C-alpha cells in the first residue's frame, strides 16, 4: 500500500471535519477516492469508525452529501469512512457502458475473470487496503472498533464483508440491501462477468448463502422501503431473513410503507443505524 494521500478538500462540520481524499491503490492499480468525517471527540482520543459502502452509480461523496449523518455522528463520537464504489479509469473495454456493471458497480468482490481481475478488487480494498490506510493516517480511529453498513449494492457489501470478517467489522447494518444476489438480475450480471460461470464461487459473495455457515454474531439491522421499485426483483430481503432464521442469526428487517430506494429513505432511518453501531462498538 502506498502511504501518500492527496487531500482534495476539507470542511468544518458539526465541530469535526469532513475531508475528501485520493490515493494510488495497490489493490485496484488506479487512483481511489474516499471521504472521512472525523468527529470532535477525535481531538482527545480514539473513536469508533463506521465504513459506509454506497450503492450503484454512487461515489465517495454521495453519503457525505445526502445522508445527513454527521450531526448525530458528532454527538456519538463516530468517525464515518466512505470509499468509492469501484475503480475508475481502469481502461477496460465496456466498463462505462452500463450503470449496473463496471464503473460505480464494483459489487465489493475480488473479480477472478479477465479483464476485470486486475483492477476490480473491491473486497480486498475494503478489508485490507482501506483499514491499513486508516491506521496510517487516522490514528484517532480505533481499529478495534470498526463497523460496516451500506445501501443496496453497498448493503450487499456490508453484509458479506461483515460475515466473512467479523473480527474486523464488529457491527453491521444495511439499507435496502441486495440480500440474495444469486437470485437477482443485478447479481447475476455482476457475478457472471466478475466471477465466471461457476455458481459455487458466487456463494462467497452472497449474504444469504454465507450466513448459513456464520450463524453466530451480533444482531443485524436492515431497513427496507415498501415503495422501493427494486424490492421484488432485485433485493429479496425475505431470503436473507429465512437464511438467518435457519442459522439462528439475530436479524431485524423493518419494512416501511411509502419509502423508496433513495436517500430520503436512508436519511429517515440513519439515526437508528448510527445508534445500532454505537451500542455495539
Q: Language-model segments: what does each one mean?
A:
Residues 2-281:
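Non-catalytic cap/lid and distal C-terminal segments of serine-dependent acyl enzymes
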Amino acid at each position: 500500500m502506498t502511504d501518500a494521500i492527496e487531500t482534495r478538500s476539507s470542511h468544518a462540520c458539526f465541530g469535526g471535519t469532513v475531508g475528501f481524499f485520493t490515493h494510488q491503490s495497490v489493490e485496484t492499480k488506479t487512483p481511489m477516492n474516499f471521504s472521512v468525517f472525523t468527529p470532535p471527540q477525535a481531538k482527545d482520543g480514539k473513536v469508533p469508525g463506521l465504513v459506509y459502502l454506497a450503492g450503484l452509480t454512487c461515489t465517495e461523496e454521495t453519503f457525505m452529501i445526502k445522508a445527513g449523518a454527521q450531526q448525530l455522528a458528532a454527538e456519538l463520537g463516530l468517525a464515518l469512512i466512505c470509499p468509492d464504489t469501484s475503480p475508475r479509469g481502469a481502461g477496460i473495454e465496456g466498463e462505462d457502458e452500463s450503470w449496473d456493471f463496471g464503473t460505480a458497480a464494483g459489487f465489493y468482490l475480488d473479480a477472478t475473470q479477465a479483464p476485470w481481475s486486475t483492477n476490480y478488487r473491491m473486497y480486498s480494498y475494503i478489508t485490507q487496503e482501506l483499514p491499513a490506510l486508516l491506521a496510517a493516517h487516522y490514528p484517532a480511529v480505533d481499529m478495534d472498533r470498526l463497523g460496516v453498513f451500506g445501501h443496496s449494492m453497498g448493503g450487499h457489501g456490508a453484509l458479506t464483508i461483515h460475515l466473512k470478517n467479523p473480527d474486523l467489522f464488529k457491527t453491521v447494518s444495511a439499507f435496502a440491501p441486495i440480500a440474495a444476489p444469486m437470485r437477482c438480475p443485478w447479481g447475476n450480471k455482476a457475478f457472471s462477468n466478475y466471477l465466471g460461470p461457476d455458481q459455487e464461487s458466487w456463494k462467497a459473495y452472497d449474504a444469504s448463502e454465507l450466513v448459513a455457515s456464520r450463524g453466530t454474531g451480533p444482531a443485524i439491522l436492515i431497513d427496507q422501503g415498501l415503495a422501493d421499485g427494486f424490492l421484488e426483483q432485485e433485493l429479496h430481503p425475505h431470503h436473507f431473513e429465512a437464511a438467518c432464521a435457519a442459522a439462528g442469526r439475530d436479524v431485524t428487517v423493518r419494512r416501511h410503507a411509502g419509502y423508496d430506494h433513495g436517500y430520503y429513505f436512508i436519511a429517515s432511518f440513519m439515526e437508528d443505524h448510527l445508534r445500532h453501531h454505537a451500542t455495539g462498538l
